[in-house]
Amino acid sequence: MFWDFKHRIEQSVTNFRETTYEAFSRCKLFLKTLPKTSIFFLTVIILECLLIICFEGYCIGQFRTVELLKNLGIDSLPISLTLFIFACFFILYLCVEALSSKNIIEIIGLLCIHVALFIYSIVQISELAEIQKVFLSKTQSSLNPITLILNRHEAGNEGIYFILEVPKRIKPFLIALPVILGVASVMLGFLAHGMNKAYGWVIYKKIGPELRMRRRYLVYKIYVTLLKIDIYFFLGVTVQYVMVLPEDAVVEFVLTILVLPLTVLILTLSFNSVSSENMFLMMTVQFFYVCGIPYILFKIIRMYTSTQKEYYASSKQMITTFSVITLLLLLFTIAIGFACSHNFKKGLKEYCM
């Protein structure tokens, strides 16, 4: 029995080594096939993501030390910081996929994501000041440091620490985020221009010299890229809606939770409908996308006009920004979706399979 157990462990270790070696071999082979411009592009993405993850992780850690924020319902900034970290992994995945398939449309999509995150990172800085104001109003404190220190026994050490220490510690890192994204975007844009020359022939080689078919294929690739970007933004905005709901909004909480699997299902059907040129399925998902417009508008308006608008005071700037970006993306997805459906049954299907 002992030898059996030992043999199983040795077999598991051997399998792990073989799998790891195979993964490294594939990675090495992948890097060898890339031109220098693409390697520089990937390097910039990796360095950028590492810096953002480190900075955001530090900021989240500082917020998590103040339990009072969660009790007061104003811990919205850590949620947006966490979404930023997930955005880094998403960007890295999209970059590797774009480079491996030599897809210049996805490269351009990456640049668009950077612009959106750049705007979002600027809003994060102003949101910190808003959270401070809401914290002070809910704890009935003053922003005067002398008053805070004199009343520290009444207000609580945790509140004093948040007002005096946390913003001072994390603000430089929040300011660094748009700087990193801005510099990286400029570098990536310059590299993408060079990659366009190398990858520009991919569509021509796949489709041939027929101009109309190439344009149809280009529209198809734009739509597929949009759907991939939609995955992050659609799910991200829904998660934010869930996290900031009041505790007594049970029905709305359940309905918002149900939007998550519905979003995944609709996006999956979108991929299938456009690749199989299924008009009925395409119109079905388009209908759901159109329904998403009033849904997002309702969520935005509700934060500013409902009787519980004070509950959203510390997070409405970030959620509004993310919602507007998602809404614009949704409108663009609908428009390109109709353009794709117009190209059905015109010989493009064989190139999309």
From Swiss-Prot:
Superkingdom field: Eukaryota
Membrane topology (UniProt): Multi-pass membrane protein
Keywords noted in UniProt: Golgi apparatus, Membrane, Transmembrane, Transmembrane helix
TM spans (from-to): 39-59, 76-96, 103-123, 172-192, 226-246, 249-269, 281-301, 318-338
Compartment list: Golgi apparatus membrane
GO CC annotations, alphabetized: Golgi apparatus; Golgi membrane; plasma membrane
Matches recorded under InterPro entries: UPF0658_Golgi
Keyword Thylakoid carried by entry: no
UniProt-listed PANTHER family: UPF0658 GOLGI APPARATUS MEMBRANE PROTEIN C1952.10C-RELATED (PTHR34391:SF1)
Protein family according to the UniProt entry: Belongs to the UPF0658 family.
Name of the protein described by the UniProt record: UPF0658 Golgi apparatus membrane protein C23H3.04
Natural source organism: Schizosaccharomyces pombe (strain 972 / ATCC 24843) (Fission yeast)
